[in-house]
């Protein structure tokens, strides 16, 4: 894949911005410094700037010609609450905070594209550059929408992307339909009656009740839904008791549920509640069932996915546009795709041929304390953004 020459010429300066962002990571809705950097750069390049959506979100507006057509390009900007292990010059300077998912690179790619689009304006219409906060659990996309993102900036479609370690630089991957799962959490408090461990018959032990629930939950996946409908119920925490010779009053179970469709999610939530309540009753215990729906599934729209495939094949070559298998990870671009047609795609962050977090042992996976974004990707990702915008708003 060949990057646009003017973007290549700016690659070093944009990479320096990326490393500055990496060194100063900010968590959900705290991205004030990052937003200031983005807004300042956009303004210097003659791009109109709107701030405040989703607290720390930034929207750049690039117009050309007379068309009322518009398209959106989105990058997330927040970091993770992690301690970085890297020791290079641009490692995090904020203890307990790190850009371990590459949002610094996503921001840099969209900034590079913004600079080129503002300089050359080879399109007819409006490009909205959406720099979104709080993707990592904060639902920043939802908050920007609630604050009027699509009312203030009416766009026909919107595209989002994520770097993908292990996939070669210059390769892209996409899938029509469900591609990322919904993310949901549950908490079940089983209440029995405490007793001496030597006299369990005098109490109601909540621990075996909880154990029965954990096993029964897996039969929801294997026996209550269709085998072709993917779902995962993961019990990740069980807490009970404070002393070895005491049967506790309570046992708390917590975990996550992930599905690709809301119908399956509805089924699982209903059946988990039934299993929890009926199992507790069978043992003479009581339970409090809590289920929190976080991110919905990310479902790419067919027409926009086909459009991306066509443009990506022209830019990167058909052999470098891959189909990726759905993942049970979650992404809050899902909220955007509930409101607007669009497509979310992956960009190869390298298969071992880059710095790889400084250890030189191959690419680090996302959310790894030795991860680093591959700067070689910046001009390629920016080129893809530019070509998507120009193709959507072709003169």
Regions found by a protein language model. Name each.
Residues 14-15, 28, 35-39, 110, ...:
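Hydrophobic face of alpha-helices
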Residues 1-99, 104, 108-111, 115-123:
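Acidic/His- and Gly-rich active-site-bordering loop/insert found
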Residues 21, 60, 73, 103, ...:
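Divalent metal-coordination and catalytic microenvironments
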Residues 74, 83, 186, 345-349:
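Non-cysteine beta-strand/loop elements that form the S-adenosyl-L-methionine
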Residues 58-59, 80-82, 86-98, 104-105, ...:
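Histidine/acidic-residue-rich, glycine-tolerant segments that coordinate divalent metal ions
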Residues 50, 128-130, 288:
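A structural signal for isolated positions on well-ordered beta-strands in alpha/beta enzyme cores
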Residues 211-395:
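Metal-dependent amide/peptide-bond hydrolase catalytic core
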């Amino acid at each position: 894949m060949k990057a646009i020459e003017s973007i290549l010429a700016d690659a070093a300066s944009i990479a320096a911005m990326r490393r500055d962002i990496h060194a100063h990571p900010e968590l959900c809705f705290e991205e004030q410094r990052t937003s200031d950097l983005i807004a300042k750069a956009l303004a210097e390049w003659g791009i109109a700037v709107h701030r405040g959506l989703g607290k720390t979100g930034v929207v750049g507006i690039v117009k050309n010609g007379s068309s009322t057509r518009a398209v959106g390009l989105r990058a997330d900007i927040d970091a993770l609450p992690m301690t970085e292990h890297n020791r290079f010059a641009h490692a995090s300077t904020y203890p307990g905070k790190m850009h371990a998912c590459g949002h610094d690179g996503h921001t840099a790619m969209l900034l590079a594209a913004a600079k080129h689009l503002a300089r050359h304006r080879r399109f007819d219409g409006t490009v909205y550059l959406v720099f979104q906060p709080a993707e990592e659990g904060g639902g920043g996309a939802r908050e920007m929408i609630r604050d009027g993102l699509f009312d203030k900036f009416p766009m026909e479609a919107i595209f989002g992307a994520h770097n993908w370690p292990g996939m070669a630089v210059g390769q892209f991957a996409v899938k029509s339909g469900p591609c990322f799962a919904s993310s949901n959490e549950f908490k079940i408090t089983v209440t029995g009656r405490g007793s001496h461990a030597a006299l369990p018959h005098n109490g109601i032990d909540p621990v075996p009740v909880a154990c029965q629930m954990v096993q029964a939950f897996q039969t929801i996946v294997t026996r209550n839904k269709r085998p072709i409908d993917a779902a995962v119920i993961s019990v990740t925490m069980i807490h009970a008791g404070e002393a070895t010779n005491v049967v506790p009053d309570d046992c708390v179970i917590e975990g996550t549920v992930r599905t690709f469709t809301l119908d399956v999610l509805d089924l699982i939530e209903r059946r988990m509640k039934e299993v929890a309540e009926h199992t507790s009753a069978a043992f003479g215990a009581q339970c409090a069932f809590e289920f929190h729906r976080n991110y919905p599934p990310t479902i790419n729209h067919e027409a926009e996915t086909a459009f991306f495939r066509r443009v990506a094949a022209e830019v990167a070559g058909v052999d470098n546009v891959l189909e990726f298998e759905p993942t049970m990870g979650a992404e809050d671009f899902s909220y955007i795709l509930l409101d607007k047609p669009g497509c979310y795609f992956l960009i190869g962050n390298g298969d071992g041929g880059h710095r790889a977090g400084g250890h030189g042992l191959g690419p680090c996976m996302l959310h790894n304390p030795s991860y680093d974004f591959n700067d070689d990707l910046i001009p390629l990702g920016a080129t893809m953004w530019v070509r998507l915008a120009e193709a959507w708003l072709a003169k």
